[in-house]
A protein has these predicted regions:
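C-terminal substrate-binding/catalytic lobe of Rossmann-fold NAD(P)-dependent oxidoreductases
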Residues: 1-105
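NAD(P)-dependent Rossmann-like dehydrogenase/reductase catalytic/cofactor-binding core
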Residues: 81-145
Length: 145
């Protein structure tokens, strides 16, 4: 994962020091991501949450259990799917020295594969207007899980 992310950011001339690890479990729930980000300037948890709330591809949750998050998706999602790119667990967020953020997020594979495939297809076909064309998906994203 870190190698893929490194290569992606390298296309933007950014050389980031990234680390990842993986643990395989016998479960249908895929990808829970632990993150530790060093921020450029001091901030607060409230400001971080406000920025996350403004991103329509990110959902927030008070849940810390993968079963609850993905069960919500099965019960309320479009054909049982969460199409958001990430579901950030708010209780897991921790700010150290006002500029190091750690936490967990759930990354539903439906959101990653379906949304990314649609976006790249639209970008390929309509490079100057793909953003407006994929806005029809907005009603399928959750603000909160």
């Amino acid at each position: 994962h870190a190698r893929d992310a490194f290569l992606l950011f390298e296309t933007l001339n950014l050389k980031l020091n990234l680390f990842s690890s993986a643990m395989k479990l016998n479960t249908q729930y895929m990808h829970i991501l632990h993150f530790h980000l060093k921020l450029k300037s001091p901030t607060t948890i409230q400001k971080i949450i406000a920025k996350l709330e403004k991103n329509d591809r990110i959902a927030l949750t008070d849940k810390i259990n993968a079963n609850e998050v993905f069960s919500f998706g099965r019960d309320h999602g479009h054909f049982g799917r969460i199409l958001n790119q990430a579901v950030v667990s708010v209780p897991s967020l921790s700010l150290i020295n006002k500029n190091e953020l750690t936490g967990f997020c759930f990354t539903p594979q439906d959101g990653n594969s379906i949304l990314s495939s649609l976006a790249i297809t639209e970008w390929f076909l309509y490079p100057h207007s793909y953003e407006s064309k994929i806005q029809c998906l907005n009603p399928l994203f959750f603000d909160e899980v």
